Amino acid sequence: DADRCIAVDENGKVIDGDLILYICGKYLMEQGRLEGNTIVTTVMSNLGLYKACDKIGMKYEQTAVGDKYVYENMLKNGYILGGEQSGHIIFSKHARTGDGILTSLLIMEVILEKKQSLATLAGEVKIYPQPVIRVMVEAATDEICEKYVNSVVKVIEDQGLTE
């Protein structure tokens, strides 16, 4: 549905959403167009993105995984750029969700304006190994969740917060 953008540089290296956020964020920040000099990412973003941002003074906020959470944070705090490693990139001045075509156009703008290759632009970020571990959970999770939810509801009721 064209809501994501993953690029490939001239050397065949995949440029994922983290790299795109860095490239576009840095470009917008240099132009004074990045609100709060901040991008919004998710907890799945690579450590290399954060280290590269720190190096240039670009701030970041993390959300839960999901472009919905990224957009909520952007809207709440007035940020204009956010996204996910998966390529969901949101430019809130233009759309409320990821737009792959818009993202690809901004990447091309950065390449043309800075007169640098995509490999050079992305090369400022050192990507670190990032294992993803899936944990299998027994079917009893519904019972556990119900107990947890019930205990939270009880605390809320006990504190008189239901009115």
Give the residues covered by each predicted segment.
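Short Gly/Thr/Asp-enriched flexible loops that form oxyanion-binding sites at enzyme active sites
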Residues: 3-21
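Phosphate-binding and adjacent anionic-ligand microenvironments
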Residues: 10-11, 31-163
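Motif I (Walker A/P-loop) of helicase-class P-loop NTPases
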Residues: 21-24, 104
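A conserved helix-loop-strand patch within extracytoplasmic ligand-binding domains
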Residues: 23-33
